[in-house]
């Protein structure tokens, strides 16, 4: 649970507890929950950390208002619509020196200079931008629009860095059939036209490569995939793309009848696929070299236990075919991971950590990419014969490319720094650590912990060497 959600829930629980002494009628129990209190639904810091913003439902209204509060407390002030143009939003990404921050507001990219407070609007488009970040050298702001990635420079120029297409490469030569070879050999006109076409394409490509003002050509992943997501390295050298098989059976969505409607007629709401009817679609991860548009599938075979079937005995009892090859995997999306990201780059763009989950939910791996060999090398495996928790899977990089992660390997969620067997547990004991936030220098970790008893959560702090909890 994130800090904002936790504090909002706490407020609601406290309000409920304070009213527990008063008998509650059935009418009140079934009434709109505004009488309990309206909790804070989300909260975030301004880019300069001098104030806090939060959103709260207005009593008796579906509208959510945004408020600001000084970092030292005091009286909260509601932000009027006219002041939204200067508002910092959540999800800020900072440059290496932490002098600038970028964020998304209303689908557009903004940059805040922490020195003088200047706010620069980078995009104003009908499409939604996402995932803003600074390039490794700090000279560009990178962001995503749909399946494509763009770079903005201080000159105001926005250029495409990576255009991803789930299509066949139109310039890729198809295999020459025997009939085609026969025609080209016998009909000189066809052979000449083919040679001229290839010469024109080669000249076009060479001019495009030589012209620094020209946009990069698109990267084609083939017509048999559907793009599910992607990430671009801060140095702009690599990208990774998540795909599923095109045409794969996702299962029939359920139809939920609604009988109480404004129209007076029954209506149907489309809901998720019924549990057990179809497994989630297996995913693949592709390594793209941006400069050359070369695409390689990432090899997962080095993950321990990837080819071991934890359901082998059940398959045998049911007289089903045994598992052949590797287990089906997913690169967990943020919704499935309780809001935690699933692919994290080091600040210099030289390392990428990825979270992979078996579709049978018995294993979760954290791995680092071997770029030269297009392989994922396991850093940490969490395995359970029952079920791997959706929560407590946060991970990332600290300054100096130090790796950190949460794991329930001890039975409780704890914070670790380091790779594999060299990882050091910063926290331990009969409590859980969650919602980790590091300071900019990577020397202090702040997190939720419940050391006193399971329902009593506090904000805890610990040094990166494990001291000072």
Ranges and model annotations:
Residues 1-8:
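Bacterial N-terminal signal peptides that target proteins for export
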Residues 8-12, 20-469:
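Beta-propeller folds
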């Amino acid at each position: 649970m994130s800090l904002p959600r936790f504090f909002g829930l706490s407020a609601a629980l406290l309000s409920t507890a304070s009213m527990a002494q008063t008998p509650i009628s059935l009418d009140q129990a079934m009434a709109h929950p505004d009488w309990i209190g309206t909790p804070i639904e989300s909260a975030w810091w301004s880019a300069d950390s001098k104030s806090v913003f939060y959103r709260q439902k207005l009593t008796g209204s579906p509208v959510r208002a945004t408020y600001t509060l000084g970092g030292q407390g005091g009286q909260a002030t509601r932000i009027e619509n006219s002041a939204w143009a200067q508002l910092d939003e959540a999800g800020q990404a900072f440059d290496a020196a932490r002098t600038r921050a970028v964020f998304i507001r209303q689908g557009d990219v903004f940059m805040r200079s922490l020195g003088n407070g200047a706010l620069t609007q980078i995009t104003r488009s009908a499409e939604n931008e996402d995932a803003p970040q600074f390039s490794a050298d700090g000279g560009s702001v990178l962001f995503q629009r749909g399946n494509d990635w763009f770079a903005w420079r201080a000159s105001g120029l926005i250029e495409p860095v990576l255009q991803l297409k789930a299509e066949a490469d139109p310039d890729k030569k198809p295999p020459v059939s025997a009939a085609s070879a026969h025609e080209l050999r016998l009909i000189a006109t066809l052979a000449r036209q083919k040679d001229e076409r290839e010469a024109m394409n080669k000249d076009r490509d060479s001019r495009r490569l030589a012209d620094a003002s020209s946009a990069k050509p698109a990267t084609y992943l083939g017509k048999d995939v559907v793009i599910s997501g992607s990430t671009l390295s801060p140095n702009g050298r690599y990208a990774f793309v998540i795909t599923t098989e095109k045409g794969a059976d996702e299962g029939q969505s359920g139809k939920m009848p609604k009988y109480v409607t404004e129209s007076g007629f029954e209506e149907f709401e489309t809901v998720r696929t019924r549990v057990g009817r179809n497994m989630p679609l297996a995913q693949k991860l592709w390594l793209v070299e941006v400069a050359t548009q070369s695409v390689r599938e990432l090899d997962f075979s080095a993950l321990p236990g990837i080819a071991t079937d934890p359901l082998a005995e059940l398959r045998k009892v049911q007289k089903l075919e045994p598992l052949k090859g590797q287990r089906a995997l997913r690169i967990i999306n943020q919704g499935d991971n309780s809001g935690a990201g699933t692919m994290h780059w080091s600040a210099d763009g030289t390392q990428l950590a990825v979270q992979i989950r078996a579709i049978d939910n018995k294993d979760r791996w954290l791995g680092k990419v071997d770029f030269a060999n297009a392989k994922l090398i396991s850093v940490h495996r969490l395995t359970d014969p029952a079920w791997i928790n959706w929560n407590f899977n946060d991970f990332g990089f600290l300054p100096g490319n130090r790796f950190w992660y949460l794991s329930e390997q001890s039975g409780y969620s704890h914070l670790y720094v380091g790779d594999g067997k060299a990882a050091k547990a910063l926290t331990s004991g009969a409590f859980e650590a969650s919602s980790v936030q590091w300071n900019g220098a990577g020397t202090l970790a702040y997190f939720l912990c419940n050391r006193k008893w399971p329902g009593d959560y506090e904000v805890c702090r610990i040094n990166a060497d494990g001291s000072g909890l």
